[in-house]
Design a protein with these regions (language model features):
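Flexible glycine/proline-rich
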Residues: 22-27, 36, 77, 138, ...
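Short glycine-rich, flexible loops that bind phosphorylated cofactors or substrates
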Residues: 99, 153, 250-252, 298, ...
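Solvent-exposed alpha-helices and their adjacent loops that cap or buttress functional pockets
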Residues: 48-50, 61-63, 81-85, 98, ...
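Generic secondary-structure signature for well-ordered alpha-helical cores
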Residues: 9-20, 35, 136, 143-156, ...
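Short, glycine/charged-enriched hinge/interface segments at domain edges or termini
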Residues: 2, 13-15, 55-217, 360, ...
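Intrinsically disordered, low-complexity, positively charged segments
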Residues: 2-65
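Helix-rich terminal scaffold detector
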Residues: 4-5, 165-292, 296-302, 306
Length: 407
């Protein structure tokens, strides 16, 4: 069996970057992936302006004059248009253009009125103090955002500050989803004896919505090979990606692998991880296939660890963005952790700082692949290496805090 890292490397190496793009206004670009490099068309700020409410004057005059004549005011959007001469100053507001001749701003708290139009200063600022220079934030022609960057509440306002109203983004992925099994009942329907609710399709839909995918829902497939083949063919024609839940184990009614081999290609089938061993990756023509396990915890863990970076690659996110989807920290185990040697284990945990400021983590609930309730009280995965056995409280372990997908 492949390790998780081997599976990720093989999968990401096969998946192509997208080619389809569209141009959209900024207000429609949240969580989209940029399809072009963006260079600044202007300097930001585009003019020297004041960082403080205060007075603008000539730095050289501070050693020549005891007090200064106030000759006008400069407001943001309504600048002073004259020229400052020796012994003069201009009342200036934050963000206002620096008047011609001025090269320092003294904040108003360091000024004292000595007459109706005269000010004395009790400060010795440096040349250029409290002045924001042209291009100090962004210089004209500088690379602002690289192709493959995710557009969000940090990057979109930056583009707006440059006056950029439209950008080219990669088209949204069309993702088909379905669940398999005669035992499944749609959420909201009456539950018959021996049936369970289709939690996984509901969960996958939520995750795909957060990833800004276009979702094609093929509902629940009964255990019928002919129906599998028909639905897989329809999904292949309509989508970029097909994600199934269930049907990837070794039971008599698990038809997914057989149909995938008939219509397409199985790239790998099992991974040495727990939960999530029966995970499938393959192709149906131009459509990429991901087969999640039927157990709810296994399905969510494999989606998070494998499908999430795969969809990011297919959506156009750059390599650094994909690497940043997960991050690992070292914490001290606050509880004993049960672990068998052989597979990498992702246990649900809760990390926190103790009274001494140490990063601690404790296991949350039962760790079975069918125990979904533990996720609700968790904020991280406790990642235990394949060769590691039981962990005793006090030992160091690796944790992986949940990213925004699970928050």
């Amino acid at each position: 069996m492949l390790s998780l890292n081997q599976a990720l490397e093989e999968m990401l190496g096969q998946l192509p970057a997208p080619s389809s793009t569209e141009t959209l206004p900024l207000n429609q670009c949240a969580n989209r992936i940029l399809a072009e490099d963006i260079f600044s068309p202007i300097d930001v700020p585009s003019f020297d302006n004041s960082a403080m409410d205060g007075y603008a004057l000539r730095f050289e005059d501070l050693e020549k004059f005891a007090d200064f004549r106030v000759i006008g005011k400069s407001f943001a959007g309504n600048p002073f248009t004259g020229q400052i001469q020796a012994g003069e100053c201009v009342r200036i507001m934050t963000g206002a253009m620096i008047p011609a001749g001025a090269d320092v701003v003294i904040m108003q708290e360091q000024a004292e009125t000595v007459a109706d139009d005269r000010i004395r200063f009790n400060a010795q600022p440096k040349l250029g103090a409290n002045i924001r220079r042209v291009g100090e934030d962004v210089k004209q022609g500088a690379l602002v955002l690289a192709k493959g960057s995710k557009l969000n509440v940090a990057s979109l306002p930056l583009l707006a500050s440059l006056g950029i109203a439209h950008v080219s983004v990669f088209s949204r992925l069309k993702v088909a989803i379905l669940s398999t099994g005669d035992e499944l009942t749609s959420v909201g329907e009456p539950l018959e004896a021996g049936k369970i609710y289709d939690t996984n399709r509901f969960t996958v839909r939520l995750l795909l919505e957060k990833l800004n995918c276009e979702i094609l829902d093929y509902d629940i497939l009964s255990d019928d090979p002919a129906l599998f083949e028909k639905t897989f063919s329809e999904a292949q024609a309509a989508s970029d990606v097909l994600i199934t839940s269930g049907g990837v184990s070794v039971g008599e009614a698990d038809f997914t692998k057989a149909v995938l081999e008939k219509l397409g290609k199985v790239n790998f089938w099992k991974i040495a991880m727990k939960p999530g061993k029966p995970f499938a990756f393959g192709q149906l023509g131009k459509t990429w296939f991901f087969g999640l396990p039927g157990n709810p915890v296994s399905a969510l863990v494999t989606f998070y660890q494998l499908v999430q970076p795969a969809l990011a690659k297919l959506s156009g996110l750059n390599a650094q963005g994909i690497a940043n989807l997960t991050s690992n920290l070292t914490a001290c185990a606050a509880t004993n952790l049960k672990k068998a040697v052989g597979r990498q284990d992702f246990q649900r945990g809760f990390y926190y700082l103790d009274e001494q400021g140490n990063l601690m983590v404790k296991a949350v609930g039962m760790q079975g692949s069918h125990i979904f309730s533990a996720f609700y009280e968790s904020n991280c995965f406790i990642v235990l290496e394949a060769e590691r056995g039981n962990v005793t409280a006090g030992e160091k372990v690796t944790i992986q805090p949940f990213n925004a997908l699970l928050s």
